[in-house]
């Protein structure tokens, strides 16, 4: 159910004029997609007991470290600890995650992390939106094996591939 909702939201993002006008290499002023997805999870995810905001944040940060070579994420007190550190091209920042018990706080923490790493990224091939989608996908997979999000580009390709019609055989 959540996958269908997220696919629908991706479709809406494709057709939304405000999102179409975004710069493809936009900086992390705000993570619009993250906020929308977290609101969908809060409102529509059926199994509320599976939603663990801090664990979702940790999963997302681990994915961030995997896909962005320059970023290192460390949990000095373990993944259940009160802080985490993010290092990017020699710069390091410590973030508090002791009070992360709500999906709105997860969004806020991710915004802080993206605001920190974005100016230091040197790989021009990486787009902030692609990184955001990958992080979100990992966070949603922590809910259950069927939850995830796809990028608007992949969704658009999927819809084109499944588009079409069947003709009759000419039998009366």
Locate each region found by the language model:
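Flexible, low-complexity junctional segments that flank or bridge functional domains
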Residues: 1-172
